């Protein structure tokens, strides 16, 4: 009989968990599991308090689900990754573990941690088994003709869909209940430093809750997703991002439920649908993270970005963070982030574009602020989104494209329903004036307790275009490539 240890990290689920499935293949093996928290490491990586809280409550939920399978989930608090490695080695010795099972993580610090774990445990005679679990296909399975990581989403998407037509990744079922063990018990998970600071009504706890949310979206919202997804006042998106980010649900299972609930539609229609596009963008950004490790250090993927002279006005940055820029759609989005730890995707694009191309603040400042506040914070997606907005990443928006807050506001929140929800100071402003409340305030001589715009949009746009153009030209004159 062998003793197998499952090392849970960013995969807090029992359904379709590759490491869990593989560890439970032999009915005679004893299976235990472990989660090691690393508060200092998370702090250094700017993981948000809301995400940590969300994760801890799901860890408790996972522990109860594992107990139903007669699998103990042990818990230990270390400080950082290096400290966690030493504890893992100690744990394996203490519990006489034979085999360690875990699912890969792809950021550079996590990859180095796993390299050290495998090296040190293997030297001590333990068998270490890692699995690709977070993505539909591994980076080695999706390569361009030069056997390199794709840099253009369209070509990446085409390759993935081609692979899916040939092979739909299968989901692993929940393992069968292990033989009863008198040592089975519920270990204590410390919540001494964790507050319930996320909205449980907005993001209910539990793998089953995530599964139900996915199924309800596919049944009731999928058909209208393309038409309604850009309107932040509508309940039109899946709201699955926190669950995907913490590994409470898998992208494979998202695809499985989509294909099952919409089985009357042709496969290619589903694989090219706008919602599945979002799953593929997630895959794309992860493949970039794997293929270009410097992304983990917030380095851009174009060389000319270093020539941009950022203004980095601290007062403007604080106004942006607090939702006090005087641009209603920007401020409503930022206040949604501050309140919920989540922001509608359209608003993420608008607010990030505004920070980088109108306020001319280094995109890394925005990246840091988002990741330290988002409940669905994810290095690959957050970095990819910010580099996209700043026009310095792979397949990014052209630098000449700058989101106009007024146009975006009128288009996607015409009646101001979303704006008034998060900016109560504007509750008395008529709907058709909500996008430029100060003009109405002057006309009616009605004072509103809301800041004036901190910049002139038109002037800031001209300045931005000039600076970005100069940066590209300067690099070109020096004989260097633009990307």
UniProtKB/Swiss-Prot annotation:
The keyword Repeat does not apply. Disulfide bonds: none annotated. Its cofactor is FAD; (6R)-5,10-methylene-5,6,7,8-tetrahydrofolate. The record marks 310, 363, 386 as: Electron transfer via tryptophanyl radical. DNA binds at residues 229, 408. FAD binds at residues 225, 237-241, 376-378. Its EC number is 4.1.99.3. One of its GO terms (molecular function) is FAD binding. (6R)-5,10-methylene-5,6,7,8-tetrahydrofolate binds at residues 109-110. The keyword DNA repair applies. Keywords: Chromophore, DNA damage, DNA repair, DNA-binding, FAD, Flavoprotein, Lyase, Nucleotide-binding. It comes from the Bacteria. GO terms for biological process: DNA repair; response to light stimulus. Binds 1 FAD per subunit. InterPro entries: Crypto/Photolyase_FAD-like_sf (IPR036134), Crypto/Photolyase_N_sf (IPR036155), Cryptochr/Photolyase_FAD-bd (IPR005101), Cryptochrome/DNA_photolyase_1 (IPR002081), DNA_photolyase_1_CS_C (IPR018394), DNA_photolyase_N (IPR006050), Rossmann-like_a/b/a_fold (IPR014729). It is an enzyme of class 4 (lyase). It catalyses: cyclobutadipyrimidine (in DNA) = 2 pyrimidine residues (in DNA). Residues 2-136 form the Photolyase/cryptochrome alpha/beta domain. Residues 278-285, 345-346 are annotated as: Interaction with DNA. Involved in repair of UV radiation-induced DNA damage. Catalyzes the light-dependent monomerization (300-600 nm) of cyclobutyl pyrimidine dimers (in cis-syn configuration), which are formed between adjacent bases on the same DNA strand upon exposure to ultraviolet radiation. Monomer. Belongs to the DNA photolyase class-1 family. This is Deoxyribodipyrimidine photo-lyase. It comes from Buchnera aphidicola subsp. Acyrthosiphon pisum (strain APS) (Acyrthosiphon pisum symbiotic bacterium).
């Amino acid at each position: 009989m062998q003793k197998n240890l499952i090392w849970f990290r960013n995969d807090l689920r029992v359904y379709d968990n590759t490491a869990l499935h593989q560890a439970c293949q032999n009915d005679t093996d004893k299976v235990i599991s472990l989660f090691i928290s690393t508060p200092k490491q998370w702090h250094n990586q700017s993981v948000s308090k809301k995400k940590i809280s969300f994760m801890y409550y799901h860890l408790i939920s996972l522990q109860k689900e594992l107990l139903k399978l007669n699998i103990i989930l042990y818990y230990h608090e270390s400080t950082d990754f290096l400290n966690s490695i030493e504890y893992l080695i100690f744990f394996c010795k203490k519990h006489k573990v034979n085999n360690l099972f875990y699912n890969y993580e792809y950021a550079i610090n996590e990859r180095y941690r796993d390299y050290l774990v495998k090296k040190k445990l293997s030297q001590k005679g333990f068998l270490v088994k890692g699995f690709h679990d977070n993505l539909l296909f591994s980076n080695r399975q999706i390569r361009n003709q030069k056997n390199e990581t794709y840099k253009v989403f369209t070509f990446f998407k085409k390759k993935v869909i081609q692979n899916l037509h040939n092979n739909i990744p299968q989901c692993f079922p929940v393992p069968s209940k292990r033989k009863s063990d008198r040592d089975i018990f519920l270990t204590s998970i410390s919540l001494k430093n964790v507050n319930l600071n996320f909205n449980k009504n907005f993001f209910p706890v539990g793998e089953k809750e995530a599964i139900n949310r996915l199924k309800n979206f596919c049944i009731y919202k999928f058909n209208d997703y393309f038409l309604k997804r850009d309107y932040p006042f509508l309940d039109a998106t899946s709201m699955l991002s926190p669950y995907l980010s913490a590994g409470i649900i898998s992208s494979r299972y998202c695809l499985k439920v989509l294909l099952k609930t919409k089985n009357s539609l042709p496969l290619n229609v589903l694989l090219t649908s706008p919602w599945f596009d979002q799953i593929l963008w997630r895959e794309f950004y992860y493949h970039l993270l794997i293929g270009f490790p410097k992304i983990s250090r917030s380095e851009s993927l174009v060389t000319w970005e270093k020539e941009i002279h950022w203004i980095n006005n601290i007062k403007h940055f604080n106004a942006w963070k607090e939702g006090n820029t005087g641009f209603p759609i920007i401020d409503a989005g930022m206040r949604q982030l501050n309140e919920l730890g989540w922001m509608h995707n359209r608003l993420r694009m608008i607010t990030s574009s505004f920070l980088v191309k109108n306020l001319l603040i280094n995109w890394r400042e925005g990246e840091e602020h988002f990741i330290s506040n988002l409940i669905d914070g994810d290095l690959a997606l957050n970095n990819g989104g910010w580099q996209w907005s700043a026009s310095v990443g792979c397949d990014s928006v052209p630098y000449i494209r700058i989101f106009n807050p007024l146009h975006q506001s009128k288009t996607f929140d015409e009646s101001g329903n979303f704006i008034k929800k998060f900016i109560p100071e504007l509750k008395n402003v008529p709907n058709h004036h909500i996008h430029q409340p100060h003009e109405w305030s002057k006309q009616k001589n009605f004072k509103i307790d809301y800041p004036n715009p901190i910049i002139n949009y038109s002037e800031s746009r001209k300045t931005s275009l000039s600076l970005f153009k100069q940066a590209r030209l300067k690099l070109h004159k020096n004989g260097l490539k633009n990307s």
